[in-house]
Amino acid sequence: MFEKDIESLKALGADITTGEIKQQPELWLDTLNIYKDNKDAIDALLADARAMGEGRLSVIFTGAGTSDYVGDTCAPYLRHAGDTNLYDFKPIATTDIVSAPRDFLRAEDPTLLVSFARSGNSPESLAAVEVARKFVKNIKFLNITCAPEGKLAVESADDPNALTLLI
């Protein structure tokens, strides 16, 4: 696939997917560097979140549409490789949080809501943050987005309970 010229790939309808696959190694390295550059802030957010209460911290991975799949991938891995004595890792779609918060959120559980969002403008992503903020007594937010100008990043910029990572 990588040996075909762009016109051949376009004719096959494979030019975009091939380009995305080809850029993955570089993007993973970029993402690792973003993590390293923000490690102190991430560690501080996790320490603050753990200090919110006794017992395990509920870590909810959420997103809308394809961004929801990130949490579906992270949570099972972290349940296996992460510290499950300190953290309860759960993937929950934004639409589930918005439509039935009592089914997915516990008001008394200290929570870290990790939101994945490409644009940071999807109504359900923004609503999930607001619903969680109103419903959960002790909550912190980690926003991972591609868009510094998106509402998710902009609206949490001055929030001491939020950290936004731009990838």
Regions found by a protein language model. Name each.
Residues 1-44, 48-53:
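Cofactor-/ligand-binding subdomain signature composed of acidic, glycine-rich
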Residues 53-167:
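Glycine-rich phosphate-binding loops that contact phosphosugars or nucleotide phosphates
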